[in-house]
């Protein structure tokens, strides 16, 4: 997304009185190593949310891990190795597996409009792309994104990154994070697990 789109989403979230003091969107401009060092050390959770099989493996998630931030993510890239080290019960995994994504791509069987019409929260979010919520009343600003999610005007297949398919699973993972965070001792233990040598290395 362009910087303009990110700022528009931030403006909506940051001016929502219902979540004032609880949630804020901050767009980090000129992202570089010096900024990253602060973020890695300060993060409570490392969100690595690329669609399984779609993302080249990077090192950012490892740096969050070494600073004690539990992983919320898909089984993609280096997340697979992190989960292998800490145990799946100590991570917050969501979404399709790589094989499931590949099967849908090769054999079909996924229609994002089914998700859209059967999950009112997802429908509400997608509809907001067109009702001007995030674009100061401009109903056409996000039309390409809207079309790419629900029809084939922009791509050969709709929702090629399975965003709508993974969304409910992502929301459920966020709830698991919230529940785990309320257990202060358990959360601290999990954070220490992420920073310590893995059992495989200490045998």
Model regions: which residues?
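Single conserved hydrophobic/aromatic residue that forms the stacking wall/gate
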Residues: 1, 5, 197, 201-203
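Catalytic binding pocket for nucleotide-activated donors in carbohydrate/polymer assembly enzymes
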Residues: 41-42, 49-189
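Short, basic, glycine/proline-bearing loop/turn elements
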Residues: 21, 46-47
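Nucleotide-activated donor-binding/catalytic signature segment of Leloir-type glycosyltransferases, i.e.
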Residues: 3-33
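Short acidic alpha-helix that forms the nucleotide-activated donor recognition element
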Residues: 34-42
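N-terminal Rossmann-like NAD(P)+-binding subdomain of aldehyde/semialdehyde dehydrogenases
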Residues: 2, 190-191
């Amino acid at each position: 997304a362009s910087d303009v789109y990110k700022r528009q989403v931030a403006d909506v979230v940051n001016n929502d009185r219902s979540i004032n003091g609880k949630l804020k969107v901050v767009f980090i401009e000129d992202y570089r190593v010096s900024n990253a060092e602060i973020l890695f050390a300060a993060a409570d959770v490392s969100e690595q949310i690329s669609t399984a099989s779609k993302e080249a493996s990077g090192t950012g998630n490892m740096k969050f891990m070494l600073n004690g931030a539990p992983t919320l993510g898909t089984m993609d890239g280096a997340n697979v190795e992190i989960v292998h080290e800490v145990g799946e019960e100590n991570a917050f995994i969501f979404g399709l597996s790589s094989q499931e994504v590949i099967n849908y791509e090769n054999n079909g069987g996924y229609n994002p409009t089914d998700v859209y019409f059967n999950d009112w929260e997802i429908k509400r979010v997608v509809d907001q792309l067109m009702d001007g919520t995030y674009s100061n009343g401009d109903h056409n600003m996000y039309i390409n994104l809207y079309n790419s999610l629900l029809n084939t005007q922009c791509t050969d297949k709709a929702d090629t990154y399975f965003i709508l398919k993974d969304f409910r699973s992502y929301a459920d993972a966020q709830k698991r994070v919230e529940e785990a965070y309320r257990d202060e001792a358990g959360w601290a233990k999990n954070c220490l697990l992420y920073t310590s040598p893995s059992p495989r290395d200490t045998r």
